[in-house]
């Protein structure tokens, strides 16, 4: 691998810069079995065989039994961020296979704390996986995380971090950006204490990604764009999904002001994802496509060419409103209200447009209030603009 990477222009010094380590550390990676930092091993495989995901999966699987306890901990995080959950299962099995007899040996080596932390990380990462693969609703995820948080009082830093990240994502998925921001500020000092810089950087990337959403929804568009470009231009960031999110969010920041720029950035996000290699990236692609379709519907671009099958139910109602088919829109939104027990900020806005008149005005006012309560001062402009017609 080392020789092939060199022939492709990735000398040990260049890899050292990319990995943010010394070139002697990179030399030792290739000279000592099992010496690799797991993140750097995965990145080196991607540089070695960029178009062969099965090759990379095969070698990660082969290396898993040889990983140190610290690398097993890092592997849980890295594979979660890549969305490679079958490989993460292999890592989890390796962690869970530690018997009491082995634990006694590890105590003598001074590894018992890391072994214990790894065992406790497994259920926390399993919960993150449910969210990433869309096998749990935002409400169910929130309730599950809340219950875990109350029942498990963690004190070890890594466990606290993943537990709080689960909590942040639970508020994030419900659109409560005020709580997201509060927990981010609480968590940052803990993350900065992590000694393993690749693990620390991965956690910080998660925080950066969520901060983009917070800044965007607080209508701090320049700040949001700056963070996006930090993620995009970070040479040490090898996560496809975070770069895709960053491009999409730059595009989203232009949703109301510049249709063409918004469209170009969102299409760049789709290019980064390419043909999704796992379920997490499939879902990421669906979300980008949905945002792109929202952009087209909002600006009324080629509405009759939009495939209804590509839209989720709420956006279908938005399209029907723009096409003047208000009754269809109302029917969809009433079904959503019956299923979920409430309408989201966006759905209240769509209902306001569809119903019209004084009743429509009330829905628009509820939408504005809902956006305000959740701390979304970017999309609040939707009901605000619509309400101007009533003045």
Question: For each of these PLM feature ranges, what is it?
Answer:
Residues 1-167, 171-172, 325-329, 359-362, ...:
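Flexible inter-repeat linkers and adjacent short helices
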Residues 79-101, 130-148, 172-191, 216-230, ...:
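Helix-turn-helix repeat elements of alpha-solenoid scaffolds
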Residues 37, 66-74, 115-123, 155-166, ...:
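Generic helix N-cap/helix-start motif at coil->alpha-helix transitions
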Residues 2-9, 16-17, 25, 270-276, ...:
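C-terminal non-catalytic interaction modules
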Residues 95-118, 147-160, 190-201, 232-241, ...:
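Flexible helix-coil transition and linker loops at the boundaries of alpha-helical arrays
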Residues 73-82, 120-135, 161-176, 203-218, ...:
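Tandem amphipathic alpha-helical repeat scaffolds
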Residues 22-46, 255-281:
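Extended, hydrophobic interaction surfaces within ordered domains
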Residues 228, 234-237, 245, 266:
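A cross-family "folded-core" feature that marks the main globular domain of proteins
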């Amino acid at each position: 691998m080392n020789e092939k990477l060199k022939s492709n222009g990735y000398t040990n010094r260049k890899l050292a810069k990319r990995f943010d380590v010394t070139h002697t550390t990179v030399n030792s990676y290739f000279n000592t079995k099992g010496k690799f930092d797991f993140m750097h091993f995965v990145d080196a495989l991607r540089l070695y065989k960029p178009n062969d995901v099965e090759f990379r999966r095969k070698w990660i699987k082969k290396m898993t039994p040889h990983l140190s306890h610290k690398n097993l901990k890092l592997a849980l995080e890295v594979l979660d961020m890549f969305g490679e959950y079958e490989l993460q299962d292999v890592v989890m099995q390796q962690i869970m296979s530690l018997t009491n007899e082995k634990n006694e040996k590890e105590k003598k080596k001074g590894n018992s704390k890391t072994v214990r932390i790894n065992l406790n990380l497994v259920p926390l990462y399993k919960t993150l996986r449910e969210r990433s693969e869309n096998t749990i609703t935002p409400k169910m995820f929130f309730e599950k995380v809340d219950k875990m948080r109350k029942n498990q009082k963690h004190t070890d830093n890594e466990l606290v971090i993943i537990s709080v990240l689960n909590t942040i994502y639970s508020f994030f998925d419900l659109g409560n950006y005020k709580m997201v921001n509060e927990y981010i500020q609480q968590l940052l000092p803990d993350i900065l204490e992590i000694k393993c810089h690749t693990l620390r950087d991965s956690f910080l990337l998660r925080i950066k990604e969520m901060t983009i959403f917070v800044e965007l929804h607080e209508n701090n568009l320049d700040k949001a764009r700056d963070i996006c470009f930090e993620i995009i231009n970070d040479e040490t960031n090898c996560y496809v999904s975070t770069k895709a999110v960053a491009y999409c969010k730059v595009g989203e920041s232009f949703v109301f002001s510049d249709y063409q720029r918004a469209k170009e950035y969102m299409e760049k996000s789709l290019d980064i994802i390419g043909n999704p290699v796992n379920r997490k990236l499939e879902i990421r692609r669906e979300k980008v496509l949905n945002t792109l379709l929202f952009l087209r519907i909002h600006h009324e671009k080629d509405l009759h060419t939009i495939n209804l099958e590509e839209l989720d139910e709420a956006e279908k109602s938005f399209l029907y409103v723009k096409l003047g088919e208000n009754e269809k829109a109302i029917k969809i939104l009433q079904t959503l209200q019956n299923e979920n027990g409430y309408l989201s900020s966006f759905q209240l806005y769509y209902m306001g447009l569809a119903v019209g008149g004084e009743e429509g005005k009330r829905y628009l006012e509820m939408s504005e209030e809902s956006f305000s309560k959740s701390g979304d001062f970017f999309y609040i402009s939707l009901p605000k603009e619509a309400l101007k017609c009533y003045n």
